[in-house]
Amino acid sequence: MAVCIIDHDNIRGVIYFEPVHGKDKVLGSVIGLKSGTYSLIIHRYGDISRGCDSIDSPEIFIGNIFVNRYGVAYVYLDTDVNISTIIGKALSISKNDQRLACGVIGISFINEKIIHFLTINENGV
């Protein structure tokens, strides 16, 4: 299993790449985007030293995600990507060829942990 943590400005999410019933799936959620359609794209290298500006050209289009009016996208996509070949590569969330958020895909162990998103308002609460 592989995982990518997205944390860029107000955009946050967790994207998992995992086998489910013999097929590879892309699962997760993202918050903080405006409603609409966005693309999930894997890039050849995982250099995010200058944020999303430092990742190279797109390599693999994973699919589109749909953000609801509350700014939440629930991700459940089929993929033909071999999970072992994407470790260390960058994943971006893009719209109209603009990279809005990104992260590096890493190895994840299967466990029973649940990740909760915490949003903080302008008062720090």
Curated annotation (Swiss-Prot):
Keyword check for Metal-binding: no
Tree of life domain: Viruses
InterPro entries xrefs: SOD-like_Cu/Zn_dom_sf
Keywords in alphabetical order: Disulfide bond, Host cytoplasm
A biological process from GO: superoxide metabolic process
Organism ancestry: Viruses, Varidnaviria, Bamfordvirae, Nucleocytoviricota, Pokkesviricetes
One GO MF term attached to the UniProt entry: metal ion binding
GO cellular component assignments: host cell cytoplasm
Disulfide bond annotation, renumbered to this chain: 52-102
Transmembrane segments: none
Function: Virion protein with no enzymatic activity.
Family membership: Belongs to the Cu-Zn superoxide dismutase family.
Name under which the protein is recorded: Cu-Zn superoxide dismutase-like protein
